[in-house]
Amino acid sequence: IAHMGLHEKVCQMMFVNPENLVLSHDVTKLDKEFKSALKKYPVGGIMLKSKNIQTKKQLKKLLKKMQDNSDITLFLAVDEEGGTVSRVMQKLGNIDGGDIGSMYDYRNLGGDIAYENARQIGDNLSYYGFNLDFAPVADVWSNPGNTVIGKRAYSNIYSEAAELIPYAVRGFHAGGVLCTLKHFPGHGNTKEDSHYGNAYVYETKDDLENNEFQSFRAGIDAGADFVMVGHMIVTDISNIPSDLSKEIVTDILRTELGFSGVIITDSLQMESITD
């Protein structure tokens, strides 16, 4: 970092979709326009979506070419949680065989299953060339009316999620990828979906400490590499989205919870931010 110029340092803070660099078309290969954009904007990471994925051979080639043509090693990421949020395995299958459903459906089967599911996901991602997964979901489905998290969560019970998340973290690592706890400080008790507007958390800070933070603390202690901070507004702490809040990001996540890894925002294209 000491040898980087200001432009490089700013670009390194950006995690983008390929289409943020190539505005004219969906990216499925490293064409001239994409290659030039990577050189001009040395971003820190690139996240692929389903539209960027066609075949096993195509995906491996795309990821390798992106990495080979970046002067600074890229984080290459995807949303691969299992179940409904699956960009790679839903399209290309599981190289280890079988299907992996929503994590919530395995909640009564113990930590070894949470580990094995995460390991298989990691196996698949690292096979193609990804080095980071935006998973596991550390939110707890505590509000039955919550639709944005739902069965993406490992449990609807705080203590149970806190038991399972460390197994998942270790499983992803065993599969060869870094992992991300999301969506801090907890999106499972909201009524609203932050994809489509402001989502509010009405719990007090003490409530969060005793409830939502359990699974995040457990994941951090297990060695999670990234924490994704969501756009939820915690009314007891701040009147702005959590990922813009010093109280949430610096005072609580970095200082109180002691997380020293990479902190990343949720997508800045979501309506809770763009509106």
Model-flagged regions — what are they?
Residues 1-21, 39:
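Mature N-terminal segment immediately following signal peptide/propeptide cleavage
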Residues 5, 23-33, 52-67, 74, ...:
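Second-shell residues forming the walls of enzyme active-site clefts
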Residues 11-18, 44-48, 74-80, 132-136, ...:
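Hydrophobic faces of well-ordered beta-strands that scaffold small-molecule active sites
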Residues 36-50:
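A short aromatic-anchored loop/beta-hairpin motif
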Residues 80-84, 140-143:
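Acidic helix-start/capping segments at beta-turn-to-alpha-helix junctions
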Residues 99-130, 135-169, 173:
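A substrate-binding/cap region within the structured catalytic cores of diverse enzymes
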